A protein has these predicted regions:
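An N-terminally biased module of ancient metal coordination in phosphate/nucleic-acid-related enzymes
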Residues: 1-72, 156-159, 170-183, 187-253
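Extended substrate/RNA-proximal surfaces in nucleic-acid metabolism proteins
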Residues: 54-206, 262-286
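C-terminal active-site subregion of NodB/CE4 polysaccharide deacetylases
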Residues: 239-245, 250-276
Length: 287
């Protein structure tokens, strides 16, 4: 049995490694496949696939998109996306525009308190990256404003806080719909990170399942064993396929390793095969 990681990020969004470097890390970790699930962009997928072909690591083209649920930002993963789909790209372009408008407001609020950044501090070595709160947090650490990325998030970048207004709302059903129309597999990412409580978490998952969502991220670096067991039960009750991944970012989340998370995560390639058959029921069909 092989192992996979179906939730990773590159420097096309808020990861610190290039797509090719990410694939090299996956190879070194002994993984047979990874999904590249950058925020609101498919820009890194082609480079990841090229590196995967060279190294013998399967690359599942993916995406992570943010929506809103009762005042909380939630994330939905798309796996086996078709990145060249014009309708998907138009949707992601709109999502990036919404993100950029929020970024501008974050920068305005921080500047009012004397905190400013250069483009080099934010973009690093990739001028095409999708700027996220993680980029701002890393820049704060580099400037000595905060001692860690976690401190920057807690003090300045908490969702809905003084410096970080919510993004313009996107209904999660709209995200599921665009992913299904694309032929992708849609799954709610890290359900317990939203701190909704069991009842509201179940309600959210049920609502998205009713909208056609096929999966649930049952295994994640942030989960305690009890949480994974609860999610297993929720997924089974709604006939959702489980997925799992580390949510690897590199330096933004230095305690998380690709493939193993904080040390106890292992995702079987059998989960990947179930997902593959869900979106491509005919064996051998290209994704």
């Amino acid at each position: 049995m092989g192992f996979v990681d179906l939730h990773t990020h590159s420097d096309a969004s808020d990861g610190s490694f290039t797509p090719a470097q990410l694939v090299h890390l996956a190879k070194e970790a002994g993984l047979c496949a990874i999904a590249l699930t950058d925020h609101d962009t498919t820009a890194g997928i082609a480079d990841a696939i090229d590196a995967g072909n060279e190294l013998g690591v399967e690359i599942v083209p993916g995406i992570e998109v943010s929506g809103n649920y009762e005042g909380h930002e939630i994330h939905i993963l798309g796996l086996f996306i078709h990145p060249d789909d014009p309708k998907l790209e138009a949707f992601l372009k709109d999502m990036r525009s919404r993100r950029n408008r929020r970024n501008e407001e974050i920068f305005r609020r921080l500047a009012a308190d004397g905190i400013t950044f250069t483009d080099e501090e934010l973009f690093g070595s990739n001028p095409q990256t999708v700027i996220t709160r993680a980029h701002v947090a890393r820049a704060m650490v580099q400037k000595g404003i905060c001692s860690s990325v976690n401190q920057a998030f807690k003090k300045y970048l908490e969702y809905g806080g003084r410096y970080c207004p919510p993004k313009e709302e996107t209904e999660p059903e709209a995200i599921v719909k665009i992913l299904l129309e694309n032929g992708a597999f849609a799954a709610l990412a890290h359900p317990f990170l939203y701190k909704l409580g069991d009842k509201k978490t179940q309600a959210l998952i049920t609502r998205l399942a009713d909208a056609g969502m096929q999966g649930l991220e049952v295994y994640h670096s942030s989960n305690y064993p009890l949480e994974s067991r609860k999610l297993q039960k929720m997924a089974a009750g709604l006939k959702l396929l489980p997925t799992g991944g580390s949510d690897f970012h590199g330096s933004c989340k230095p305690d998380i390793s690709i493939g193993t998370g904080r040390g106890g995560l292992r995702v079987s390639n059998l989960l990947l095969e179930d997902i593959r058959h869900c979106v491509c029921p005919k064996s051998g069909m290209e994704t």
